[in-house]
Amino acid sequence: MSFPKTLNVPDKSSLLVPQTTKASATGPTTAVSYETASSEIRSIRESPYLPSSPVDSQQFDGRSIISTSGMSEYIADLNDLPSIRHDINPTSIKTGGTGSRSFKFSNCFQTLDSELSNMDFFTKYISISKGDDKAQFNNKLKHFFIFSSAGKPIYSMNGSDDIVIGYMGILTTIVSSFQENFNQELQVLELGQGLKIVAVNKSPIILISISKLSFETVESVHLQLDTLYCYLIGILSKSVIDKHFNNRLNYDLRRILSPLDFENLDELCLNLTYGIPNTSDRTQDSTFGLYTSQVLLPLSRESVKIRHTLRSKLNSIVNTNNEDVLFTILLSGNGKILNYLHPKQHNLPNKDLNMLLFIIHSLLKNQSQQDEDLWLPLCMPTFNDHGFLYVFVRQWQDLVLMLISGSKNSFDALKLSANEICTKLNNKQELAVKLINELSIPLSIEVPFVFKHFIYKDIRLNQFVMSELPTHEFSSFQFLKCYNELKVSQAKIIKHDNNLNYKKLTYLQDRDITGFMLMDKYYEFYCIIERSSEQETITSKKLIQISSQIIRWCKKNHARLFVTI
């Protein structure tokens, strides 16, 4: 094995743009809570992981969600709920070559370019462009700017330096005016028609986003800006950034950022806004997972389904007595955590773990050879934003092993531990085959065909699982938009009661899809169904019934779906 790679980290206005539709314009948004139903379901206080009543052994086989039993507890006393009906002319629904619905960006926006193809629309309004064309710059629906308190540019999602410098000068003036004239920090300017300017001041760094996407909330844009800031802290640390700006206020931070860092910032901007990959090496599922963990379900992390006994055996294999190893993480080939070992007194927050996985993925994709180890210092912003942890990374078959230490001199010790772990894995080929087989089974095959996608989050663990996205292009954006509007609708009508475990539900319709949300204090469940020409009406009872079956299945398979050991 060759010596590992080493990453050395040194100690204007709205203009003429297409306006997005408001949330209320997605068709008649209907929200129903159990508080307003005919009976309030006050008696449902089941345990967080087990059904409140015994489940017949034939109803669930540990794999299948489909049930032949009658109506579930969620349906009782909901006779007054209206039918969920897709009021769309069947001729307006187009199908692609595979029979799936053809998504069009122009259906989501009020724009004169309704005849643009998806790719043309994406290129004109969404894709990242660093050119000098000011009209092209103004067309973009989303902008991110990062600059110093002195107005020195650090990063821009779109535009060349000539264009960006002028905008950053204006934004610096606006931020300074708020500080001087109002004695407060600029946080958000809402200018109508969905246009908003959101700012986060992390002196000596200022991050600003200009969003023309009406479905985005101020909170979600704040989370996006915070993620970009965490990336900078992750590769540099707060101490290094402060040191440079303390020495010179107008320091150009771009001097210590690599080309890969700017590529990663581009990737993050597109992922966190649209759930769409910027490069071909990332899949829709991975980018949508990043969006979900950082924005839709903030501070959560995605898990992957494997048998509990298999996860336990992997735990015993990757567990090491090496005192230099602080954290051990085993990843699947698609970047999801299979095993995570940490000492009782220390734990990496999900926010840091998600950023760690993103950075490691970006480094691995740029490796010249897969048999090379990586050794790099990274700062974990929430864990400790002033220091570094040292990460050893090795790929074994389709898995990724990460050993993390607090000592910069622990490379040899961590490499020795990695050798021992890989030897154990090589001696357990039968286990490796079982693992690869289980990871190859998509979660979507266990979901009723009526569902196009679902997300299930365990609130106590702050972990979620979701089914795979449909393969047709840009479907992730349509789902992302629907889920966001679901959350906004839910937030307006749901009243939380800490003493009672009320179930809460809401749904909305957006052209040919219906989004549905069901939650209590133990879980959050989101799903999307798609209207077919053969089935124009889905009753509320039927939708809740199938959703409850998926929820029960997730609870029954809790140990398989989530990292609990």
Swiss-Prot record:
It is a peripheral membrane protein. Residues 1-37 are annotated as: Disordered. Keywords: Autophagy, Endosome, Membrane, Protein transport, Transport, Vacuole. It comes from the Eukaryota. GO terms for cellular component: fungal-type vacuole membrane; Mon1-Ccz1 complex; multivesicular body membrane. It is found in: Endosome, Multivesicular body membrane; Prevacuolar compartment membrane; Vacuole membrane. InterPro entries: FUZ/MON1/HPS1_longin_1 (IPR043972), FUZ/MON1/HPS1_longin_2 (IPR043971), FUZ/MON1/HPS1_longin_3 (IPR043970), Mon1 (IPR004353). Its main location: membrane. The keyword Membrane applies. Pfam families: Fuz_longin_1, Fuz_longin_2, Fuz_longin_3. GO terms for biological process: autophagy; protein targeting to vacuole; vesicle-mediated transport. Residues 16-37 have a biased composition (Polar residues). Belongs to the MON1/SAND family. In complex with CCZ1, is required for multiple vacuole delivery pathways including the cytoplasm to vacuole transport (Cvt), autophagy, pexophagy and endocytosis. The MON1-CCZ1 complex acts at the fusion of vesicles with the vacuole, through its regulation of the SNARE complex during the coordinated priming and docking stages of fusion, and particularly at the stage of tethering/docking. This is Vacuolar fusion protein MON1. It comes from Candida albicans (strain SC5314 / ATCC MYA-2876) (Yeast). The lineage of its organism: Eukaryota, Fungi, Dikarya, Ascomycota, Saccharomycotina. The gene is MON1.
